[in-house]
């Protein structure tokens, strides 16, 4: 008769206790829509484009969600704030 195998904590190890490897799901890298279109400046009067980067609550979407590069995210933030200031965009959602 063989004795059951034990791990380093002196617990019995069963073959069903072996962990299966977990597949790592890699997210697709988002590309900046403004870099693709070769936009130099983001226009604060283009409300339709700015609305795509605002959440349903009226908050500006972060880079990790919108996929913008740092340069265009800064320009986008300034453009949204300017559009809000002159009442083209709401500060909060309805």
From Swiss-Prot:
Magnesium: present as a keyword of the record?
Answer: no
GO molecular function terms noted in the UniProt entry: small ribosomal subunit rRNA binding; structural constituent of ribosome
BP GO annotations: translation
Under PROSITE patterns, the record lists: RIBOSOMAL_S18 (PS00057)
Q: What is the superkingdom listed in this entry's lineage?
A: Bacteria
Entry keyword set: Ribonucleoprotein, Ribosomal protein, RNA-binding, rRNA-binding
Q: Which Gene3D superfamilies does the entry link to?
A: Ribosomal protein S18
Q: Which GO terms describe its cellular component?
A: cytosolic small ribosomal subunit
* Family, as annotated: Belongs to the bacterial ribosomal protein bS18 family.
| Subunit-structure text | Part of the 30S ribosomal subunit. Forms a tight heterodimer with protein bS6.
State its role.
Binds as a heterodimer with protein bS6 to the central domain of the 16S rRNA, where it helps stabilize the platform of the 30S subunit.
Q: What's this protein's name? A: Small ribosomal subunit protein bS18
